[in-house]
Amino acid sequence: MENIEYAVSALRSGGIVAHATEGVWGLSCDPKSEQSIKRILEIKGRSKSKGLILIGGKIGYFDQELLCVTPDKRIEIEASWPGHHTWILPNANNYSDWITGGRETTACRVPNHEQARNLSLQFGGPIVSTSANLSGSPELKSEDAVRNDFETLVDFILPGAIGGANGPSNIHTLDGSMLRSSLG
């Protein structure tokens, strides 16, 4: 079995997978598995109220959310994907409060990282992706660092390397403001 198949199997069975993204390593799980989401939040020491990002292997995974925005905004969002840009979109798929942080929105991205996109594509839909770090600590940028900190806490570490970005993704709102800006 290939590494990506092991990772997908872990996700489908409610596990947590560490994997590389554009600028940092991430922790992923099935967005419909409340137990897995709780585990990620516990591992990170992260508050449920912050919400989590969903990454998708293709733009079509976010069609329902994109139907809720203006045609001009949809063009802008689609032009930024795949890319290092997360967008705060209407929660059209009714993801749980564990994903949305209790808001009526969902953070969505199609990453500019082939392995991260492929993980979602092989899974068959969006997956949770949050930085592999303890809340308030620096994001991890190497597989060795992830193995040192998370090997006993996750179900699978997908071998790989981050892309060329310098940190976590930019986070954009529909009104044009930026909640987080990355140098990458």
PLM ranges: what are they?
Residues 1-184:
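Active-site-adjacent structural elements in enzyme catalytic cores
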